[in-house]
């Protein structure tokens, strides 16, 4: 029987499945950070249980960390407690930790792939909703809750029901300057923020194959923003070339054997999906969100929609509420909307290619008066590479702030946040009310679009910036 990639991955990891019961899956990799793990480790301690597979468990600090200092005491009391707990727990249970002073420290979904912890064919979980990022490698990766974190630590397994399957095919080639972020925002604009609910999405088509691994990670990172359980891209030569030689990747003959298996991780011809969505890549232009969920998105040169234009009363009410919160009026152009802050970073867009794209726009220009612009690399290795290429100097000379690795302004859990009423062009993944700070107004864009907003002081079409 022909199977989809998701079905192959799921079936290969079923440890036990009793009739009429939820299957028990084996978990190959468990990624841990300071926010969703303390109670899980406390649960192990209370029951006298060890971590079953410490060698398959990897921890880092990211959500709460300061991006201005490596001093743990400068991060606020709750953050300090959570980070100190992670240090204690990892030491006690024998889990490898990339702490604030480790050269590999960074956002968990940046660290995993760049260290070769993430590999095709694996099941990967983390107490974080954007774990879907790792699906870019042809791995089944999804976020879990704290009680599930404890279960995986204790058993290296997890009960999971089978999801429905969705194929999203982006046909043809994207125009120059159109990034994975624009593609995924256009997809969510078409499906809506709940269009993938109950599904695992496989992204395919020429435009997807043309993406680098970093672009594919951006794509899968935001699968959750259309309500999907996970996102997948089938592995290919792009994947294998990225993985080869990384710290935890197989070496020598083991790598060759792994590649032979990874090449089987494709959806079979004739396999059926529950839902199919198709887009034409050449129709996608630079995207900017205007509302308070990622599905409320338009091309940069389009007018903000009138809520009255939505046939669905729920969508109409949502649009009215979003415009009121965002301080916007129907019919205006986003290119006429001034911004206060710019954030280039997050598990969506903080990798070296993202920083190069932003630096290309920033080079020889200056951040507009009254705008604060932050560039936050996703990890120590990304920061080091960017500095080796001189990207930090480009940003600093242009008036951007060059920060230490961390989740930063993606979420209001650390010192980087918006003040009430401030408007931000952000490369992150969520534009919910209050996501970047109480009363803050978030617009999601690509790194190049964020840099363009920084130097012009408003949203701008990068295709017009020479």
UniProtKB/Swiss-Prot annotation:
Q: Which UniProt keywords apply?
A: 4Fe-4S, Amino-acid biosynthesis, Branched-chain amino acid biosynthesis, Iron, Iron-sulfur, Leucine biosynthesis, Lyase, Metal-binding
The UniProt entry's GO biological process terms, in alphabetical order, are: L-leucine biosynthetic process
- Please give the catalytic activity noted in the UniProt record: (2R,3S)-3-isopropylmalate = (2S)-2-isopropylmalate
Give the co-factor note.
Answer: Binds 1 [4Fe-4S] cluster per subunit.
Record has Amino-acid biosynthesis as a keyword = yes
Supply the EC number(s).
4.2.1.33
Annotated binding of [4Fe-4S] cluster, by residue? 347, 407, 410
InterPro entries for the chain:
3-IsopropMal_deHydase_lsu (IPR004430), Acnase/IPM_dHydase_lsu_aba_1/3 (IPR015931), Acoase/IPM_deHydtase_lsu_aba (IPR001030), Aconitase_4Fe-4S_BS (IPR018136), Aconitase_4Fe-4S_dom (IPR036008), IPM_dehydratase_rel_enz (IPR050067), IPMI_cat (IPR033941)
What is the enzyme's main class? lyase
Q: Pfam families from the xrefs?
A: Aconitase
Keyword Iron in record: yes
Pathway membership: Amino-acid biosynthesis; L-leucine biosynthesis; L-leucine from 3-methyl-2-oxobutanoate: step 2/4
Q: Which cofactor does it need?
A: [4Fe-4S] cluster
User: Which GO MF terms are attached to this record?
Assistant: 3-isopropylmalate dehydratase activity; 4 iron, 4 sulfur cluster binding; metal ion binding
Q: What does this protein do?
A: Catalyzes the isomerization between 2-isopropylmalate and 3-isopropylmalate, via the formation of 2-isopropylmaleate.
NCBIfam families found in the cross-reference section = leuC, PRK05478.1, PRK12466.1
The UniProt similarity line reads: Belongs to the aconitase/IPM isomerase family. LeuC type 1 subfamily.
Q: How does it assemble?
A: Heterodimer of LeuC and LeuD.
This chain belongs to the protein called 3-isopropylmalate dehydratase large subunit
Q: Which organism is it from?
A: Escherichia coli O157:H7
Taxonomic lineage from the root: Bacteria, Pseudomonadati, Pseudomonadota, Gammaproteobacteria, Enterobacterales
